[in-house]
Amino acid sequence: MKPVKPPRINGRVPVLSAQEAVNYIPDEATLCVLGAGGGILEATTLITALADKYKQTQTPRNLSIISPTGLGDRADRGISPLAQEGLVKWALCGHWGQSPRISELAEQNKIIAYNYPQGVLTQTLRAAAAHQPGIISDIGIGTFVDPRQQGGKLNEVTKEDLIKLVEFDNKEYLYYKAIAPDIAFIRATTCDSEGYATFEDEVMYLDALVIAQAVHNNGGIVIMQVQKMVKKATLHPKSVRIPGYLVDIVVVDPDQTQLYGGAPVNRFISGDFTLDDSTKLSLPLNQRKLVARRALFEMRKGAVGNVGVGIADGIGLVAREEGCADDFILTVETGPIGGITSQGIAFGANVNTRAILDMTSQFDFYHGGGLDVCYLSFAEVDQHGNVGVHKFNGKIMGTGGFIDISATSKKIIFCGTLTAGSLKTEITDGKLNIVQEGRVKKFIRELPEITFSGKIALERGLDVRYITERAVFTLKEDGLHLIEIAPGVDLQKDILDKMDFTPAISPELKLMDERLFIDAAMGFVLPEAAH
């Protein structure tokens, strides 16, 4: 049963309170929620109204949730307020860890739970807008979304196959089913009286248009939260990202903020202001900076790269310190191109950004092999070079864009520490000192579920490195090869004994560059790209 839309009067989009708007969501509806971490483009007022309504009335019931990007604060925001038994029965997310209350329902087998790669999920929404049954892609082959493995299912109660293995011209692909949503929660900054919307105070666009088209073309209701409204036809047409005919309900929240907390708008993050070179931004010399510095050594002039959330995200600041940040382009999967990468939950809220694409188009570029290099954080690595990030220690985190990015990037740099859990290190006198070893080994014999396939990467001719604070590995046909160790660490005690398998030791094993361990600019010169 399709939801019933409120009527327009004289072409004006209905303007309702959030409480009135969520009354249009029927039982069993499929709700698609726009937003990214830290409050980026999150329609918080709508989410809160829906959560409160269910607490009070126990309606609507049995919703299905689609969330392409990880929105939330890794605690109680994002879609975590919707984690109420009976409100949600099914979820398909690109990333889960930013809204852990929803993840907990999946971990407890209380909801049906799927994970598509983030880029694939936004592309299936575009397919749903075009009334296409799904997409066919080689992204995800050899990983847990491959139906020969887990097929993207995250728990025991999830049974239906949404992903199928298909073959064309003797090549394997995955078919990802497109799910058409009935309701959309989207957000913009401003709209006119007919619903035409602009994003001038927002950090990015994400896939707002794709979601709105998917819901509209399948007879659903698009509910849009904005900070303000203006008169009809007063917005610049080149600034409008959502045409009014896609919008069925507008909810105005004058207290809407760009991110969680803080000022309503940070003009550096919205792209209106830029930081000049006199503004000093730097990282303290610790294991995080050490990894970012070593990762920078893998960059080349003119390269186009991606940087992921986590320990890898310091590379932009390190490059700025070294004076080479303008010699390459770093992108973020949510749309930003260039600039200084943010850190923490509001990942992608960059400053000095050069351009911003919609997220779906950014992933098209990635899937087609456009990236020269990517920097991704890892949770676990096994002896075959496989990497796991989507599920570990019993917790569902989801893949985000990890699979999309690592599947085709020409060079793949995984960044992390060798161990986890209370690891403490010091960098003194040009050496690394392990003050307190981590409790958990991250290099294990076999991964239970695979987010990155070393085997597939080698078949595709990709160059794969694993950079930690004390060791650097590369991937070859026979597995991991140790190629560098940090000065001050013992090969056996601090590296090999802290792994569940023994890597091959390169005959050219050397110390990591001594400049990495000095608390001063390295004088690093970015190498030219090989031709």
Q: Which residues make up each language-model segment?
A:
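Glycine-rich phosphate/diphosphate-binding loops and the adjacent beta-loop-alpha structural elements
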Residues: Y196, T274-Q287, R294-N306, G479-L480, ...
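Short glycine-rich phosphate-binding loop at a beta-alpha junction
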Residues: L31-V33, V304-G308
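Conserved phosphate- and dinucleotide-binding cores of soluble alpha/beta proteins
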Residues: K2-K5, I9-N23, G38-Y54, I66, ...
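Helix-to-beta-strand junctions that scaffold the AdoMet/dcAdoMet cofactor pocket
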Residues: P26
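Glycine-rich phosphate/ribose-binding loops and adjacent secondary-structure elements
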Residues: V22, R61, L281-P284, R293-R300, ...
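Short glycine-rich or small-residue beta-strand-to-loop segments that form or flank ligand, phosphate
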Residues: T30-G35, S64-S67
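Beta-solenoid repeat scaffold
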Residues: L50-L63, F328
